[in-house]
Regions:
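Alpha-helical scaffold segments that flank or form the walls of functional sites
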Residues: 76-129, 133-151, 173-180, 413-421
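C-terminal cap of metal-dependent C-N hydrolases
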Residues: 8, 352-409, 413
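Active-site gating loops and adjacent loop-to-helix segments of metal-dependent hydrolytic enzymes
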Residues: 72-106, 218, 222-248, 268-273, ...
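C-terminal helical cap
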Residues: 110-117, 273, 278-283, 321-372
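Metal-coordinating catalytic core of metallo-dependent amide/deamination hydrolases
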Residues: 134-257
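N-terminal metal-binding scaffold of metallo-dependent hydrolase/deaminase domains
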Residues: 1-44, 55-56
């Protein structure tokens, strides 16, 4: 089965060359796409034709670091005490909330996050999950929900020592079971300051067993570095490097805000990935990271939202403060870097047949030379008209296809009320 996008204006994601043509999109995890100006006028009845006259078509987006478990936090009751530092943000807000999550809350969080991702043109999610007292099967719950929406994914559970030995062991077991089932993902760890040497070593061994990487928050707050120096006599990145995390090409280091020169060198000379989460860092008042000297940087949202256009624009606008400035092209390339990471996993989704159809009427000329400028200054999630994931139309003219948006939102509201009553 194929999908034909007639009269589409294809924007090459590397050269930004615009070509008006018909695009043939094949369905399935291994399906492809091809520009075919001579596609037949009459298509087989099982095929679908979309008129894309005046529309831009380009690869859809991926999120390099999400927290689906936070989806029901919007508008939740305030913390019992106003946090004054990053550790208190974790203690009074996120750790207080994630301990209350159960299966239905996790499922609702994944469905509503999938809904918002899809409508924002995001067809692939790399997620970092936490639900310490409803841990067993939680990753499969998220995976099935994202599958229903039609999104590709790489999932992990953020294992830590913060809730005791039993929960730590359950986190390792959940990760091993999920990856052994054939699902693709990472071995997740929370952060150095909640991970002892035993857990760190076992996580690296588990990642090697499953030929994947470790996904961990790194020096998001200065407290992570202070704890590591006090407890282990070294920096966070040095500790991770000594344990083998940086040797794994599919490892993801989240945030990387507070790094010294040696740590930057360790990351630069490693094959691992760094993910930037600008808006979350601003929200938590932890500072701004500098990323322009790292060879592999992708963008995430850290659970703040599911809009990768917005994340790219945030990284661009803040670069003058954090990195001495960045070109629109560099910001766009950072947005697109996630695709290379996804390909390294050979995971379903994230291929050539993941596309976004944009309704963008510009008051000024849009050219091959200025496309990144338009993207950084003028594009908006409202321009996302339709979305194709693995060759299947999952958003059709602004509406989720195959699922009832109202049902998803009602379910999320129901579970949010249950969660909030426990806080």
């Amino acid at each position: 089965m194929s999908l034909y996008l007639r009269n589409a204006t294809w924007i090459d994601p590397e050269t930004f060359k615009a070509t008006t043509t018909t695009i043939k999109v094949e369905e399935g995890p291994s399906g492809g796409m091809a520009l075919d100006a001579h596609a037949p006028v009459e298509c087989p009845p099982e095929d679908t034709v979309l008129d894309c006259t005046g529309r831009l078509v380009t690869p859809s987006f991926g999120c390099g670091h999400h927290h689906i478990y936070s989806a029901l936090a919007r508008g939740m009751p305030p913390a019992p005490k106003t946090p004054t530092n990053f550790l208190e943000v974790l203690e009074y807000v996120w750790w207080r909330m994630d301990k209350k999550l159960d299966h239905d809350m996790i499922e609702a969080s994944a469905l509503v996050t999938g809904l918002y991702c899809a409508k924002n043109g995001v067809t692939f999610v790399i997620d970092h999950h936490a639900s310490p007292f409803h841990l067993d099967g939680s990753l499969e719950t998220i995976a099935k929900a994202l599958d229903r929406v039609g999104l590709g994914h790489l999932l992990c559970y953020e294992i830590s020592c913060r809730d005791g030995e039993e929960i730590k062991e359950k986190g390792l077991d959940e990760t091993d079971a999920f990856l052994s089932s054939g699902r693709k993902g990472h071995v997740g760890l929370h952060a150095s300051f909640t991970v002892d040497d035993d857990l760190l070593g076992r996580a690296v061994d588990l990642a090697r067993k499953h030929k994947t990487g470790v996904h961990i928050h790194v020096a998001e707050g200065i407290e992570d570095q202070e704890h590591c120096a006090r407890t282990y006599g070294k920096s966070v990145v040095r500790r991770l490097s000594d344990a083998g995390v940086l040797d794994l090409p599919l490892s993801i280091l989240g945030h990387c805000v507070h790094l010294d020169a040696e740590e930057r060198d360790l990351i630069r000379t490693s094959p691992c990935w760094v993910v930037q989460n600008t808006e979350s860092n601003l929200n938590n008042n932890v500072g701004l990271g500098r990323y322009n000297d790292f060879p592999r940087v992708m963008l995430g949202t850290d659970g703040m939202h599911s809009d990768m256009i917005r994340s790219a624009q945030s990284s661009y606008f803040i670069a003058g403060l954090a990195e001495g400035g960045m070109s629109p092209l560099a910001a766009y390339q950072r947005l697109r870097a996630v695709h290379a990471h996804i390909q390294g996993h050979n995971a379903p989704g994230g291929g050539a047949n993941d596309l976004v159809i944009l309704n963008y009427d510009s008051p000024t000329p849009l050219t091959q030379d200025n496309f990144p400028g338009h993207f950084c200054y003028a594009f908006d999630a409202r321009n996302v008209e339709s979305v194709i994931s693995q060759g299947r139309l999952i958003v059709d003219h602004g509406r989720l296809a195959g699922m009832d948006e109202a049902d998803i939102l009602a379910y999320a509201n129901e579970q949010a009320r249950r969660l909030w009553a426990l806080l």
